[in-house]
Amino acid sequence: MKISILLPFKENFSPSYAGAVSLFVNDTTRISKYKNNTFIYGNTNYKDTFKLNYINIEPKINFLQSQNKEYVNYFIKEEKINKSDLIELHNRPIY
């Protein structure tokens, strides 16, 4: 079973500056029996990230479109190529 997790846009998935969602995702994924098939998508400027299958999304800066939409559109493109059995979204009710 492949699982994809999309963190909130401004959430850092880094041990040096992690938010509550990152800590929760890190702690639960580390003990999951699916941890090898779980991919975490997020946006951080920190080079040191938690030691899991993390994919950093760096949206293009476009003054005519929000970075949140760029961020989600990148995730959707990735999902169309590499489909997941389960998608977990955190803190983005407007999507």
List PLM regions with ranges.
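Extreme N-terminal starter segment of soluble prokaryotic enzymes
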Residues: 1-4
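Functional cleft and adjacent loop/helix regions within the main domain
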Residues: 71-75
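Glycine-centered tight-turn and secondary-structure capping sites
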Residues: 19-20
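Short N-terminal targeting/anchoring amphipathic segment
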Residues: 76-94
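N-terminal strand-loop element at the rim of the active site
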Residues: 7-15, 24-70, 93-94
